[in-house]
Curated annotation (Swiss-Prot):
Keyword field: Amino-acid biosynthesis, ATP-binding, Cytoplasm, Kinase, Nucleotide-binding, Threonine biosynthesis, Transferase
Pathway(s) annotated for this protein in UniProt: Amino-acid biosynthesis; L-threonine biosynthesis; L-threonine from L-aspartate: step 4/5
Family from the record: Belongs to the GHMP kinase family. Homoserine kinase subfamily.
Top-rank lineage group of the source organism: Bacteria
Source species: Corynebacterium kroppenstedtii (strain DSM 44385 / JCM 11950 / CIP 105744 / CCUG 35717)
NCBIfam families linked: thrB (TIGR00191)
Binding annotation for ATP: 95-105
Main location: cytoplasm
Protein's name in the database: Homoserine kinase
Alphabetized HAMAP family for the sequence: Homoser_kinase (MF_00384)
């Protein structure tokens, strides 16, 4: 039987954005970056209120269908806890539908808030499982929860199982590595961009990506000089180029100049991993073409603070 959480208990969550795939690691590699949503959840006597400021304000629902609310409720269900009512406030800095893990961050914030309200009844692995279930893959979800870089994988259901099992492990990131995001002023639908991918790929291309994914884990941990080689990909970015022509053009322009650029998640954001700031002329050119350029540190794990009334 679910236990009741007292009215007045509140939680504030600071959740980082994330960049998925990192080139070759499709649905596998993820990286938390220093752009944050802040979500505050308070247990109330009844009802539901939702307030959204910043990114997504005026665009996302303010009822029980809001992703943060759905994630809170699922987290509470799994933790065998219940609340009479909720007040949810979101201060969003992560752009929506830009390939920076906004939906994974929302799900992570909701589940981690629920877990804190429920006295941390869930393990980290359970949290990642619940958050990933909203996404269908754990790369962004695990990065927002664990921080740093992650290697993730999914066990698909077999006979007798009803749901995929999601897993992730953290990877230490070399302290000199930082990320620069080139964020276009248009959005991309993850589902639409996934639909352009082929159902089968060649063994040659699969082997190419397996090797580059392995290289990327070394580049991230100990050898940033390998970042350009480690971000090469043949499994998804070439197929998405027509649907994301501006992004594909910028990836090529940056890579031709020796920068480790790749399509962040399903795009349209382009991410560059480097150990130095990019030249001002690149930033100025991108800005003149309508891209917002932000240099971001590698982020730590989600931060959760709980308060009691009085």
């Amino acid at each position: 039987m679910p236990h009741d959480i007292p009215v007045g208990r509140s939680v504030t969550v600071r959740v980082p954005a994330s960049s998925a795939n990192l080139g070759p690691g499709f649905d596998t590699l993820g990286l938390a970056v220093g752009l944050y949503d802040i979500v505050t959840v308070e247990v109330t006597a009844s009802g539901l209120t939702v307030d959204v400021q910043g990114e997504g304000a005026g665009e996302v629902p303010l009822d029980g269908t809001h992703l943060v609310v759905r994630a809170i409720r699922e987290g509470l269900r799994v933790a065998h806890a219940d609340v009479p009512g909720l007040a949810v406030s979101c201060e969003n800095a992560i752009p929506q539908s830009r390939g920076l893990g906004s939906s994974a961050a929302a799900a992570a914030a909701g589940v981690c808030a629920a877990n804190a309200l429920a006295d941390n009844a869930l393990t980290t692995d359970q949290v990642i499982q619940v958050v990933s279930s909203f996404e269908g893959h754990p790369d962004n979800a695990a990065a927002s929860v664990l921080g740093g870089a992650v290697v993730s994988w999914t066990d698909t259901p077999v006979d007798g199982e009803t749901a995929p099992q999601y897993h992730a492990i953290g990877v230490d990131v070399h302290p000199d590595i930082r990320a620069t995001a080139f964020i276009p002023d248009f959005t991309a639908s993850t589902n639409a961009v996934r639909r352009v991918l082929p159902s089968d790929v060649s063994h040659v291309d699969a082997r190419f990506n397996v090797s580059r994914t392995a290289v990327m884990t070394v580049a991230l941990r100990t050898n940033p000089e390998l970042l350009w080689e480690g971000t090469r990909d043949r499994l998804h970015q070439p197929y998405r180029a027509d649907a994301l022509s501006v992004s594909a053009e910028w990836v090529n322009r940056l890579r031709n100049r020796g920068y480790a650029a790749y399509l962040s998640g399903a795009g349209p954001t382009i991410m560059v991993l480097s150990t130095e700031d990019l030249p001002a002329e690149i930033v100025d050119t991108a800005s003149s073409e309508g891209l917002r350029v932000i240099t971001l540190p590698i982020a730590g794990p989600i931060q959760v603070n709980r308060k009691e009334l009085g």
